[in-house]
Amino acid sequence: MFRNQYDGDVTVWSPQGRLHQVEYAVEAMKQGSATVGIKSETHAVIVALKRAQNDLSSHQKKVYEIDTHAGVSIAGLLSDGRILARYLQTECSSWRWDYKQAVPIKKLAESMQLKLQANTQYYGRRPFGVGILIAGYDKDGAHIIQTDPSAEVVSMHGTSIGARSQSARTYLERNVDNFEKSTPEQLIVHALLALRDTLPAEENLNAQNTSIGIVGKDSPFSLLEDAQVAVHLNQVSTHPRTTGGAAAAAAPGGAEPMQM
């Protein structure tokens, strides 16, 4: 993308009906390290690839708990992601104070949509350069909600955002019929296999660069410790990687991938 006379502010439309500032923010999301979210009847899982700036730095946090029944993963500008995660935490706390119960995930998604949309409409603001996946469980079941800087908020069975996320979505599309009845362990393996497909052939997942969050029926949101992550990665290692990152490996639990 190159600078032009229509990208000076978020309120300026191009003759083609585009908001270039919003498109630039979406590109920032696409440059972030990938994250994957999928759900079954009873659980929702988010996994994320953490990056380290160099060999001397720690890996950046990508998954946050926002309430006992929900968590988020982010792709894009991490500083923007932290602001939005804190906003969602505040929304959850306010709802609990007012109504003495956990906020419904759909209400949380609506609040996020309004927050994102305001920065695409008013002069002097810039869109958030981050995409967020919300994983939650409430009386309506498990939820995966995808958001992006354009304020598009969508409920998904499975999705991925960030760099090379199309490879992960290909895996998810081929295995979507297996998710609904999956156990929590199988769901995590599905998510990790999809995340692995976003990596170049010479790289692999490990306990240091992988975050896993899970929430479900009678199970509060939790971030897995490195030792627990390593156990699931050992299961993933039994599934061979396909050439070029294409998602065609056999599904966990013995099921064959769905052909699209």
Swiss-Prot record:
Which residue stretches does the UniProt record annotate as biased composition, category Low complexity?
244-260
Protein's GO biological process: proteasome-mediated ubiquitin-dependent protein catabolic process
Q: Which GO terms describe its cellular component?
A: cytoplasm; nucleus; proteasome core complex, alpha-subunit complex
InterPro entries the record matches: Ntn_hydrolases_N, Proteasome_alpha, Proteasome_alpha-type, Proteasome_alpha1, Proteasome_asu_N, Proteasome_sua/b
Chain residue ranges for the region called Disordered: 240-260
Q: Which UniProt keywords apply?
A: Cytoplasm, Nucleus, Proteasome
Q: Where in the cell is it found?
A: Cytoplasm; Nucleus
Q: Which family is this sequence assigned to?
A: Belongs to the peptidase T1A family.
According to its UniProt entry, the function of this protein is described as: The proteasome is a multicatalytic proteinase complex which is characterized by its ability to cleave peptides with Arg, Phe, Tyr, Leu, and Glu adjacent to the leaving group at neutral or slightly basic pH. The proteasome has an ATP-dependent proteolytic activity.
Q: How does it assemble?
A: The 26S proteasome consists of a 20S proteasome core and two 19S regulatory subunits. The 20S proteasome core is composed of 28 subunits that are arranged in four stacked rings, resulting in a barrel-shaped structure. The two end rings are each formed by seven alpha subunits, and the two central rings are each formed by seven beta subunits. The catalytic chamber with the active sites is on the inside of the barrel.
* Name of the protein described by the UniProt record: Proteasome subunit alpha type-1
Gene encoding it?
A: pas-6
